Amino acid sequence: MIDKEVIVIGAGLAGSEAAWQIANAGVPVKLVEMRPYKSTPAHHTGEFGELVCSNSFGAISADRAAGLLQKELRIFNSLIVQTADKFAVPAGGALAVDRSKFSNALTETLSNHPLINIKRIEQLDLPSKENITILATGPLTSDDLAYKIQDFTGIDDCHFFDAASPIIYGDSIDHEIVFKASRYDKGDPAYLNCPMDKYEYTNFRNQLIEGEQANLKDFEKESANFFEACLPIEEIARRGIDTMRYGPLKSIGLWNPKWGDLFDRDNRLKKRPHAIVQLRKEDLEGKLLNMVGFQTNLKWSEQKRIFRIIPGLEKAEFVRFGVMHRNTFLESPKLLLPTLQFMKRESLFAAGQITGTEGYAAAAAGGLLAGINASLIAKGEIAVTFPDESMIGSLMNFISNRNKIMSSQKKNKFQPIPASFGLVPELTKRIKDKRSRYIAYQQRSVDVLNIFKRKLDYIFNKDHTLVKIN
């Protein structure tokens, strides 16, 4: 063990992963988290890694970008993905978790680590440059610290408006109407589906558009812009009569056996719903259900009224209503190196959603990289970048100054980006079939990361300070 302590500010997904990686490298960590003493507009607990939006980490299959990212994280023994696997709930082809058990387990694991010192205080300023620090405060960074970050960077923060979906009690839905199925019968029938005919859909859309919105502060109204990957359902409804039907309410691939023979074309065309609202388990028992894709800024009374129009949800009881909040992120291409160090202070790192990555697995990946590099710096080594061929490497390259694409686009400001196969380098041999090409990307990534990990293991083990905690 070495004496130099690394400070990690924020115990969300990125901060939790970073703290775990650092401590397991034999480096002491001070993990600073302001909750529960000071909360945010979206959090409800003081637990680490609380999931405030969806409970899904995205597709599991490695021929999907999110699935490859999860696979890469497993190679590096990611605490976040290990914990997600342990508390997974059925979600078809996706990795979804019981959010309460997930965050409770993260908190317990980190609290019991001998090299992690937890401080439940609000961080009001950036530590001095003598301290190795990881900024993992997330999109809901407190105002005081956000102002200090702006002073340090000299750049106003970027922001967008994000929203969370409502959660309802599973025993309050009508199972005579709602049916269980996964799209195209992929995996277990993990979703509950509320079918709508054309009249029901049209009425529901009209009510959504006319529904009364929760108030935004004046400064928020002036600069309101939504993140396209997490639009409020009422905003989607306003974009066109069929926009919801080709988005979160699409019915294709979903079939209730009560409707008869799926392979009878006439029957299929006659019985197929005009739209379907999906519900996903929040816990293994299905006592709590998330309304998939139903992020909203409707007033709570309007949510209860309008969402009860949905067939099968006429008597729905709400555990949590949807909320909208302002998310802050850095203009990373102008500020960060691919190692996630700040260009103007290499002892300071940023990780997670504050860097402009989108999605839970991507946040964990940022924490993983920042944690590894903070450990290396603490040991007197040089920070590393992940291979370009990996999803982690390509994503971090894209948000950093190493990739000039975003910073050179003066008309289009930098916006959060999810993992995507469009970010990774092309294969040397062209593969026309998309699925086969993505599988080839996956195999290439695994191959290069296994080599990369062996090199890292050598660096961490050469002074015999690597700590392994089961």
Swiss-Prot record:
Binding positions for FAD? 10-15
Q: What keyword terms does UniProt attach to this protein?
A: Cytoplasm, FAD, Flavoprotein, Methyltransferase, NAD, NADP, Transferase, tRNA processing
* Gene3D superfamilies assigned: FAD/NAD(P)-binding domain (3.50.50.60)
* Required cofactor names: FAD
The record's GO CC annotations read: cytosol
Intracellular or extracellular location(s): Cytoplasm
Top EC group:
transferase
- InterPro entries (alphabetical): FAD/NAD-bd_sf, MnmG-rel, MnmG-rel_CS, MnmG_N, TrmFO
- EC number(s) of the enzyme? 2.1.1.74
Family the entry assigns = Belongs to the MnmG family. TrmFO subfamily.
The record's HAMAP family line, in alphabetical order, gives:
TrmFO (MF_01037)
Recorded protein name is Methylenetetrahydrofolate--tRNA-(uracil-5-)-methyltransferase TrmFO
Q: What lineage does UniProt assign to this protein's organism?
A: Bacteria, Bacillati, Cyanobacteriota, Cyanophyceae, Synechococcales
